[in-house]
């Protein structure tokens, strides 16, 4: 009687189907389908920093002083690498999506640190106070992604005048470069022109040897006009007399009485 009533109730329930086991025991089966949780939801979410809009306030907070004190954020960081020689470059990035790598860099491990050109106190920790050179990534231990952000933020802070940097002082020179360098100065005159000699030595008059003169006399006997001394171009010029004076000095001209 009880079994018949149970069978009637099972027929009326759509989600429950009767199943008779091997030993005559009825087993109730009911399919319960639940949605599997997505893989991304299983990972812990990255906490949102309260200092995202104003990152410079975190460096003045008591929490920062208790954690870092007066030392830079990368002072106590030690890189985790294989072997005794560290790689030349740090990892590309520490956070990929919601996955955080083991032993993250000094900036990625603290979610309240934000690289911003207005966060001057943080940027000063990655710049040498004596030379103004930005520390290399293997020296500070930051990943290459954060190192690129730091370099861009430091340059932007310098452009806005928030971060001081060294400008080399160059003393002005009171020298006239038009006369100090040989390539731009006036060309000095040739030594031969200063002494009055001609530019080429064969332009100056030289008395030929006597042996050569005797040979020419024998060769051009009766047709050679004897000359001695420099050529006529270098001989002193005789002043020319006026035509009136020349006519008065003629022998047949009458002379005026005194």
Curated annotation (Swiss-Prot):
It comes from the Eukaryota. Keywords: Mitochondrion, Phosphoprotein, Ribonucleoprotein, Ribosomal protein, Transit peptide. It comes from Sus scrofa (Pig). GO terms for biological process: mitochondrial translation. PANTHER family: MITOCHONDRIAL RIBOSOMAL PROTEIN S18B (PTHR13329), SMALL RIBOSOMAL SUBUNIT PROTEIN MS40 (PTHR13329:SF2). This is Small ribosomal subunit protein mS40. Residues 223-258 are annotated as: Disordered. Component of the mitochondrial ribosome small subunit (28S) which comprises a 12S rRNA and about 30 distinct proteins. Its main location: mitochondrion. The modification Phosphoserine is found at residue 49. The lineage of its organism: Eukaryota, Metazoa, Chordata, Craniata, Vertebrata. SUPFAM superfamilies: Ribosomal protein S18 (SSF46911). It is found in: Mitochondrion. Pfam families: Ribosomal_S18 (PF01084). InterPro entries: MRPS18B, Ribosomal_bS18, Ribosomal_bS18_sf. GO terms for cellular component: cell junction; mitochondrial small ribosomal subunit; mitochondrion; nucleoplasm.
């Amino acid at each position: 009687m009880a079994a018949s009533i149970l069978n009637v109730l099972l027929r009326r329930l759509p989600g429950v189907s009767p199943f008779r086991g091997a030993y005559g025991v009825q087993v109730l089966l009911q399919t319960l389908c639940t949605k599997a949780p997505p893989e991304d939801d299983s990972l812990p979410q990255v906490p949102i920093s309260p200092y995202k809009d104003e990152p410079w306030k975190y460096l003045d907070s008591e929490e920062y002083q208790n954690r870092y004190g007066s030392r830079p954020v990368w002072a106590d960081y030690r890189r985790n690498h294989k072997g005794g020689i560290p790689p030349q470059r740090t990892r590309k990035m520490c956070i990929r999506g919601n996955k955080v790598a083991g032993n993250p860099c000094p900036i990625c491990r603290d979610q309240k640190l934000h690289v911003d050109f207005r966060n001057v106190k943080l940027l000063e920790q990655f710049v040498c106070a004596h030379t103004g050179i930005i520390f290399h990534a293997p020296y500070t231990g930051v990943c290459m992604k954060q190192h690129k952000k730091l370099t861009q933020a430091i340059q932007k802070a310098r452009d806005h005048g928030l971060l001081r940097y060294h400008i080399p002082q160059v003393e002005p020179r009171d020298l006239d470069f038009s006369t100090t360098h040989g390539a731009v100065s006036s060309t000095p005159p040739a030594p031969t022109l200063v002494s009055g000699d001609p530019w080429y030595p064969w332009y100056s008059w030289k008395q030929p040897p006597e042996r050569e003169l005797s040979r020419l006399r024998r060769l051009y006997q009766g047709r050679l006009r004897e000359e001695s001394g420099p050529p006529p171009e270098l001989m002193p010029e005789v002043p020319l007399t006026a035509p009136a004076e020349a006519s008065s000095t003629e022998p047949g001209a009458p002379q005026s009485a005194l």
